[in-house]
Swiss-Prot record:
Any Gene Ontology CC annotation: cytoplasm
EC number of the protein: 3.1.1.96
Keyword Hydrolase: yes
Identification of the protein by name: D-aminoacyl-tRNA deacylase
Top-level class of the enzyme under EC nomenclature: hydrolase
Keyword NADP: no
Positions of short motif Gly-cisPro motif, important for rejection of L-amino acids: 133-134
InterPro entries, per the entry: Daa-tRNA_deacyls_DTD, DTD-like_sf
HAMAP family: Deacylase_Dtd
The organism of origin for this protein: Streptomyces coelicolor (strain ATCC BAA-471 / A3(2) / M145)
Family the UniProt entry places it in: Belongs to the DTD family.
GO function terms (MF aspect): D-tyrosyl-tRNA(Tyr) deacylase activity; Gly-tRNA(Ala) deacylase activity; Ser(Gly)-tRNA(Ala) hydrolase activity; tRNA binding
């Protein structure tokens, strides 16, 4: 499981002209990709990492500040563009495998006490954010 984590000062996701998820103020925008061997245990591990990673201001975490997270599925995180001119998606898990695992990341975050907004799985989304720093890290579990 792979996540691109961005420290933000507000973020939102729009589907078909409707805002389906948004966070205000300091928090994290998290793009989550799932591969074939990912499990519910890895989803829980990723959730714990996202909740506790100290990348907000003054080396604080979302759990320290009760900061919100916007979690968005993104299968293209497992794209491979090393050969040719088009990426392949062979390493990305199919939707019926990936969707419940992204949902599990969200459920685990909420169980930890996090405020979580989400995108819509499989939809064409427009993501807007103010990257604070900029500060972006890749997390793999």
């Amino acid at each position: 499981m792979r996540a691109v984590v961005q420290r933000v000062d507000g973020a939102s996701v729009v589907v078909d002209g409707e805002t389906v998820g948004a966070i205000d103020g300091e928090g994290l925008c998290v793009l989550v990709g799932v591969t074939h061997d990912d499990t519910k245990e890895k989803a829980a591990q990723l959730a714990r990492k996202l909740w506790s990673v100290r990348i907000l201001h003054d080396e604080k975490s979302c759990s320290d500040l009760d900061a919100p997270l916007l979690v968005i599925s993104q299968f293209t995180l497992y794209g491979d563009a090393r050969k040719g001119r088009r990426p392949t998606w062979n390493a990305a898990a199919p939707g019926d495998v990936a969707e419940p695992l992204v949902d599990e990341v969200v459920a685990q975050l909420r169980a930890l006490g996090a405020t979580v907004a989400t995108g819509r799985f499989g939809a064409q989304m427009r993501v807007s954010l103010t990257n604070d720093g900029p500060f972006t890290v890749l997390v793999e579990v």
